[in-house]
Amino acid sequence: ALDRIGDTLGIGGIFRGLRTIPVMLEYCRMMEKVCPDALMLNYTNPMGILTGALQRATNVRVVGLCHSVQVCATNLCMMLGLPSDNLKWQIAGINHQGWLLRISRNGEDLYPEIRRRAQLPENRGKDDVRFELMKRFGYYVTESSEHTSEYVPWFIKAKAPELIDRFQIPLDEYPRRCVAQIEAW
């Protein structure tokens, strides 16, 4: 798989894991001594690599979580031009594979309108990978289209480069984010 974000899979994720696993193992060793029944909530990338390593190498209970969960519903509504106040939502999943199971505003189920707006031409290119998964599975995935395309091999295939254009997957997403972040600083 191509590593568009740079900290998940492939060579970027492997090297980031090699730097981060030893530090996280130290934390887990301390937890084994001080609070052996505690649950570690890991928000650190590479999520899958770290969570798996800690589960295999320690006795600490570890769950991988993604920060996208907290902003998923609000960002989805804002992107589609829906009011984002008074939202109630329910998400289930682990690591970078959370799913927005329910979303409502003032008691009204927003999924029918979200599905309708996701198909509008003006929303083409905004979040095509996630919209495709929503069409196929019925739910919106919490992680960005770029990250999701790293985990789901349907979207980027060496023998089907037209998928990159079809789903408008930016292969330079991580460098673009870094430049924007540096400029903001």
What residue spans do the PLM features occupy?
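Rossmann-fold NAD(P)-binding glycine/threonine-rich loop
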Residues: 1-58
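Glycine-centered flexibility sites
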Residues: 10-13, 64, 93
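Short secondary-structure capping/junction motifs at helix and strand boundaries
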Residues: 37-39, 63, 84-88
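A structural signal for short, well-ordered beta-strand segments and their strand-loop junctions
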Residues: 40-44, 64-66, 91
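Short acidic, glycine/serine/threonine-rich loops at helix termini
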Residues: 51-56, 75-77, 101-103
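Acidic, His- and aromatic-enriched active-site or binding-groove loops in soluble protein domains
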Residues: 60-76, 80
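Long, compositionally biased stretches enriched for glycine and/or charged residues
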Residues: 78-185
